C-alpha cells in the first residue's frame, strides 16, 4: 500500500493473493513468475520452501505451469546465461541450487576455480555443477597458466622442496617437467587457467561409476 502525499488515495498493491515486487534484500537474479492473471516475484537464491509457497499462491504445482522471466542483478553474463539455460532445460529449483553453489564458491574466493573446473569437466547441468563445487578441493587450479611451460613453472613455484637458481633457470626444461606430471593425472588448459585432477577420476566425482555399476548389476 502506497501513500504519496496528503489528500491522495491509498493504492493497494496487494491483491490478497500475490505479493507485489519488492526488492528488500540483495539477490543475484530476480525472477518473475506468471500464471494466467497472477504474478509472483522471487529473489534468487532463496529457500526451496519460498519457491513452493510462490507456486501455491499462483495456483501452480510446478514451475512448468508458469512463464518465467529472469533479470540479472549481481551475476556476470556467463553465470546468468547458465542460469537461464538451466531454468529452461531443467527447472527453477535446479537453477536456484546452482546459484547457492556459486555463492559458496564466491564466499571461499573460488569462483574462478569453479568456472575452470566446469570447463575442465565440460559439464553444465545443475547436478554436475553442484557435485563439482562440492568436490572442488580435489582439483588443483593454476590461475593464468595456459601452456606447459607456464604449468611447469607454477608446479615448481608451489613446491617448497624445489628451487631453481635464476642463473640456470633458462636451461631448465619446464615443459618436460609439466608433461611428466600430466602423465600421472588428468589435465586441461582452460580459458582462465589450468586444472589438474589427481587420485580420482571425473566419473568418480560425478558419481557416474556408481551409475554404471548399478546398470551392470541391473542387467545381470
List PLM regions with ranges.
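N-terminal ordered "arm"
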Residues: 1-63
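Short, hydrophobic/π-rich interface segment
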Residues: 2-10, 154-184
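Short, flexible beta-strand-to-coil junctions
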Residues: 32-37, 71-73, 198
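Conserved aromatic
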Residues: 44-48, 142, 171
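Long, highly charged low-complexity segments enriched in Glu/Asp and Lys/Arg with interspersed Ser/Thr
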Residues: 179-212
Amino acid at each position: 500500500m502506497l501513500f504519496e502525499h496528503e489528500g491522495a488515495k491509498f493504492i493497494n498493491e496487494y491483491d490478497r493473493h500475490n505479493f507485489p515486487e519488492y526488492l528488500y534484500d540483495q539477490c543475484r537474479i530476480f525472477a518473475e513468475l506468471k500464471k494466467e492473471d497472477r504474478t509472483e516475484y522471487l529473489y534468487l537464491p532463496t529457500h526451496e520452501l519460498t519457491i513452493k509457497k510462490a507456486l501455491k499462491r499462483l495456483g501452480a504445482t510446478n514451475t512448468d505451469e508458469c512463464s518465467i522471466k529472469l533479470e540479472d542483478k549481481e551475476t556476470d553474463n556467463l553465470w546468468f546465461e547458465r542460469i537461464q539455460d538451466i531454468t529452461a532445460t531443467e527447472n527453477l529449483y535446479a537453477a536456484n541450487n546452482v546459484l547457492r553453489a556459486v555463492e559458496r564458491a564466491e564466499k571461499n574466493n573460488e569462483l574462478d576455480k569453479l568456472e575452470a573446473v566446469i570447463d575442465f569437466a565440460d559439464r553444465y547441468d545443475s547436478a554436475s555443477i553442484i557435485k563439482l563445487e562440492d568436490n572442488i578441493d580435489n582439483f588443483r587450479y593454476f590461475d593464468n597458466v595456459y601452456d606447459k611451460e607456464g604449468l611447469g613453472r607454477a608446479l615448481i613455484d608451489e613446491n617448497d622442496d624445489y628451487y631453481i637458481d635464476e642463473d640456470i633457470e633458462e636451461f631448465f626444461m619446464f615443459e618436460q617437467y609439466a608433461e611428466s606430471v600430466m602423465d600421472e593425472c588428468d589435465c586441461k588448459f582452460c580459458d582462465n587457467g589450468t586444472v589438474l585432477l589427481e587420485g580420482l577420476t571425473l566419473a568418480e566425482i560425478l558419481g557416474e561409476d556408481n551409475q554404471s555399476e548399478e546398470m551392470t548389476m541391473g542387467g545381470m
